[in-house]
């Protein structure tokens, strides 16, 4: 029975401009789809923009537009970038298409009918200032796993799936106030009830044998931890309405509706869509995703399909990639670091060069750092000195010394015996979505061709052994034709150009690999690529390095903003370290209902009675340390003058009724979306250069204040000094 390849790339959020790392999945799926088509397999490559949910609604608020207008804008931006990269989607749609709402609601109604939906009264964060329930991504705070800034559904840094209540020091993303928990009703999909069927499906040898090792490990680990009911509704306006009485003001959570978008996008364009999505016998479903999307494709979406009790096409091949990072920096438009899709277009570097480099370094098993110098070196050596050089030198030699016409070839069997087996290896690598390995094997063949040319010295032997050299060149010409086919999934425009040299209509079929006929003439030859110059690379690196902002970043106030987290805590209990009586062990309330303690050498400065019940300020993101065997989870801050007088900053000097857990910020950072800095050592804190000036804590002349009450932080006892 004929096999069909149904290929998807993870639907990108439509609230931003894709950067180089975001392009890995759509490019990977594009290469596989091109391979599939030239192998004679009926193929459908689907992608589209993921347009509903909190991220879109939030971005629309920031840009002061409607969610739909925002989606329209970014859809066109995404589409133009993908077009420039020569990504040949069969369908590039949107989840705001006319079929999406109906398709999502039908899935829900079937799940409800089959007993997989539960109604729960839950506590959800509510913002008293904005008077709204906060969806998961409207809540930000510190990830309990890695201490990075995270949103309430998932940590982007460590990929841990979260609930908003898991976050440390949660805040409303809109107003930055601390939300309260309030009762609300939501609908949940009963994943535990589907678990047995899901595990049976995953353990089936035909299911997961073609999944990445990392994807399988992550999925099995998630199953071992036990599936939990997961909410599928949210208190939002921008989303798919819930077709259930009492839920008229709620929408489906984006994780529930987005993967169904693969189906609805197909349905919107293809009349016989069921032949693709309800055809397990013939269709091979191949999905390309980033590692942060693994569980949504191996657990969540399969559970939705299983729970509907319909014969949906199920996942066969899963190709998950790691992260592509940028020069040890974070991609950030605002900071000018990293290169984004629209930037790539303006570099003057052809799209095939970018495609080549991304495939050459595709992060299949580990993260990869994009480095400008490496781009130049890989492109100049592998793409140009190896591949492009072979094409140019062989075709130019033929045209110059033997003419345009290609005679009947005398097959050099030893030559092809070394090459033909490699074709099968490369095609198998393509089939198994090992794209980086496939490309590197192709380049080995190109390198072999260059070696054969060099070793035979045709420029010397064309007179003494003309027939032998002519046969060598003709065999190399057919090798180049084959290389143009194998390279087509990676550098399609260049492959077409090579075949234009032969004057033929394009011949991109794996069936003609190794054949020695079909080329009649060399019409013309020209250089495929120009080498990347060091000056150009240096200029581009500088342009996208964010170095123009480095001086600003090094200012103490910016170091404080990015690296230091100060928080108000209340001293609930004080103990002495039995091993060192000068060390006070302070038991603290930081507003999270979790015990926290710090160790400080306070003997001779304070008694326990003077400090008990007081509110002080600690460096809350200091790396934990041990003092005489006792763990310390932060450091209190104090002021010291030139005479070495030392006094702790007591918050009661600044405000009558301090609140434990409140953050200390710069006065000019009011109402800003502040990040939660990572763990730091004491040196990072020292570089912030906090001082007391006329009784007020300042950095570079800017006052430190309480985030919510806005009161200035005062130092009554040490009006002028340093903070340590």
UniProtKB/Swiss-Prot annotation:
It comes from the Bacteria. CDD domains: Anticodon_Ia_Met, MetRS_core, tRNA_bindingDomain. It catalyses: tRNA(Met) + L-methionine + ATP = L-methionyl-tRNA(Met) + AMP + diphosphate. PROSITE patterns: AA_TRNA_LIGASE_I, TRBD. Keywords: Aminoacyl-tRNA synthetase, ATP-binding, Cytoplasm, Ligase, Metal-binding, Nucleotide-binding, Protein biosynthesis, RNA-binding, tRNA-binding, Zinc. Binds 1 zinc ion per subunit. GO terms for biological process: methionyl-tRNA aminoacylation. Pfam families: Anticodon_3, tRNA-synt_1g, tRNA_bind. GO terms for molecular function: ATP binding; metal ion binding; methionine-tRNA ligase activity; tRNA binding. Its EC number is 6.1.1.10. Residues 560-665 form the tRNA-binding domain. Its main location: cytoplasm. The keyword Aminoacyl-tRNA synthetase applies. Its cofactor is Zn(2+). ATP binds at residue 333. Gene3D superfamilies: HUPs, Isoleucyl-tRNA Synthetase, Domain 1, Methionyl-tRNA synthetase, Zn-domain, Nucleic acid-binding proteins. One of its GO terms (cellular component) is aminoacyl-tRNA synthetase multienzyme complex. PANTHER family: METHIONINE--TRNA LIGASE, METHIONINE--TRNA LIGASE, CYTOPLASMIC. Homodimer. Is required not only for elongation of protein synthesis but also for the initiation of all mRNA translation through initiator tRNA(fMet) aminoacylation. This is Methionine--tRNA ligase. It comes from Borreliella afzelii (strain PKo). The gene is metG.
């Amino acid at each position: 029975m004929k096999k069909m390849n149904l290929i998807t790339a993870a639907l990108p959020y439509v609230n931003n401009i894709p950067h180089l790392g975001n392009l890995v999945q759509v490019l990977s799926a594009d290469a596989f789809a091109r391979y599939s088509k030239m192998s004679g397999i009926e193929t459908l490559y689907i992608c589209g923009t993921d347009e509903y949910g909190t991220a879109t609604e939030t971005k629309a608020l920031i840009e002061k537009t409607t969610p739909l207008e925002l989606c329209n804008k970014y859809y066109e931006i995404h589409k133009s970038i993908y077009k420039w990269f020569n990504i040949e989607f069969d369908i590039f749609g949107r989840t705001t298409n006319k079929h999406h709402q109906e398709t999502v609601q039908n899935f829900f109604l079937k799940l409800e009918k089959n007993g997989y939906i539960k109604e729960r009264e839950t506590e959800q964060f509510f913002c008293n200032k904005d008077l709204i329930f906060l969806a998961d991504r409207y809540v930000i705070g510190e990830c309990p796993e890695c201490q990075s800034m995270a949103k309430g559904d998932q940590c982007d840094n460590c990929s841990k799936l979260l609930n908003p209540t898991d976050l440390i020091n949660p805040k409303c993303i809109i107003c930055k106030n601390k939300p309260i928990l309030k009762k609300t009703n939501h609908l949940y999909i009963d994943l535990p009830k589907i678990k047995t069927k899901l595990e049976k499906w995953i353990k089936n040898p035909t299911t997961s044998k073609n999944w990445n090792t990392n994807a399988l490990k992550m999925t099995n680990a998630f199953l071992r931890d036990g599936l939990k009911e997961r909410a599928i509704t949210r208190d939002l306006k921008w989303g798919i309405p819930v077709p259930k009485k009492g839920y008229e003001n709620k929408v489906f959570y984006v994780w529930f509706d987005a993967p169904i978008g693969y189906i609805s996008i197909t349905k919107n364009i293809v009349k016989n869509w069921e032949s693709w999505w309800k055809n397990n016998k013939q269709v091979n479903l191949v999905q390309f995703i980033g590692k942060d999307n693994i569980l949504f494709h191996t657990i969540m979406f399969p559970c939705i399909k299983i729970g509907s009790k319909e014969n949906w096409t199920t996942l066969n091949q899963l190709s998950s990639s790691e992260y592509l990072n940028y020069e040890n920096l974070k991609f950030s438009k605002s900071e000018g670091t990293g290169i984004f899709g629209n930037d790539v277009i303006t570099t003057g570097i052809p799209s095939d060069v970018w495609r080549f480099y991304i495939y050459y370094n595709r992060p299949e098993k580990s993260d990869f750092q994009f480095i400008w110098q490496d781009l130049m070196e890989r492109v100049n050596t592998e793409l140009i000195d190896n591949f492009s050089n072979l094409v140019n030198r062989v075709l130019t030699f033929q045209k110059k010394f033997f003419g345009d016409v290609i005679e009947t070839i005398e097959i050099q069997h030893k030559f092809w015996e070394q090459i033909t087996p490699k074709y099968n290896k490369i095609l198998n690598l393509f089939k198994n979505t090992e794209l980086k390995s496939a490309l590197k094997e192709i380049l080995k063949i190109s390198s072999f061709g260059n070696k054969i040319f060099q070793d035979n010295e045709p420029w010397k032997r064309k007179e003494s052994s003309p027939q032998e050299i002519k046969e060598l060149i003709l065999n190399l010409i057919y090798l180049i034709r084959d290389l143009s086919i194998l390279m087509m999934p990676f550098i399609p425009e260049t492959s077409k150009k090579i075949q234009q040299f032969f004057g033929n209509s394009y011949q991109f079929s794996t069936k003609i690999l190794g054949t020695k006929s079909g080329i009649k003439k060399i019409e013309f030859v020209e250089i495929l690529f120009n080498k990347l110059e060091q000056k150009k690379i240096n200029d581009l690196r500088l342009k996208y390095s964010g170095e123009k902002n480095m001086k600003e970043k090094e200012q103490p106030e910016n170091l404080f903003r990015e690296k230091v987290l100060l928080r108000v805590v209340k001293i609930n209990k004080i103990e002495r370290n039995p091993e060192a009586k000068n060390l006070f062990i302070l038991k603290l309330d930081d507003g999270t209902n979790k015990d926290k303690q710090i160790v400080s050498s306070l003997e001779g400065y304070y008694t326990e009675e003077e400090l008990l019940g007081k509110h002080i300020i600690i460096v809350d993101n200091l790396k934990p340390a041990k003092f005489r065997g006792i763990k310390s989870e932060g450091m209190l801050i104090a002021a010291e003058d030139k005479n070495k007088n030392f006094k702790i900053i007591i918050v009661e000097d600044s405000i009558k009724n301090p609140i434990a857990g409140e953050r200390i910020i710069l006065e000019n950072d009011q109402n800003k979306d502040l990040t939660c800095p990572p763990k730091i050592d004491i040196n990072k804190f020292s570089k912030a250069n906090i001082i007391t000036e006329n009784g007020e804590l300042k950095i570079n002349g800017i006052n430190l204040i309480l985030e919510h009450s806005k009161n200035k932080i005062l130092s009554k006892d040490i009006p002028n000094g340093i903070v340590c």
